[in-house]
């Protein structure tokens, strides 16, 4: 099943977002300007594009795994969420996680990837208890934040 995505190029000199390989889930997003990030620094970087995410879908902006592994470049709010109603320029909140070296990004560098996925839009219903709502108790209950173990050394 194929769905189209309307892309508005705000900066015609930058490449159109594209998949690096046939079948890739994400399309590469490019930096619209030069940026230097000191260790620990974060910055909102424009991409030079806007998109019209269809209703019932969401755009998710993820880090590029190679940049994260090689130089420590990541996204502060990973993944960044682009709602269907947003029509402004996509900007990526990048952060340099390397403790020692600055990261230099040049205009036109690939900085992130955009995935577009279907999303459920459930109606929110307030209840006074889950029992009242007919939702069975689970074995997990309220356990979270490491409650399942798995890290004996921590």
From Swiss-Prot:
Its EC number is 3.6.1.23. Keywords: Hydrolase, Magnesium, Metal-binding, Nucleotide metabolism. Disulfide bonds: none annotated. Signal peptide: none annotated. The keyword Magnesium applies. This enzyme is involved in nucleotide metabolism: it produces dUMP, the immediate precursor of thymidine nucleotides and it decreases the intracellular concentration of dUTP so that uracil cannot be incorporated into DNA. HAMAP family: dUTPase_bact. Belongs to the dUTPase family. This is Deoxyuridine 5'-triphosphate nucleotidohydrolase. The gene is dut.
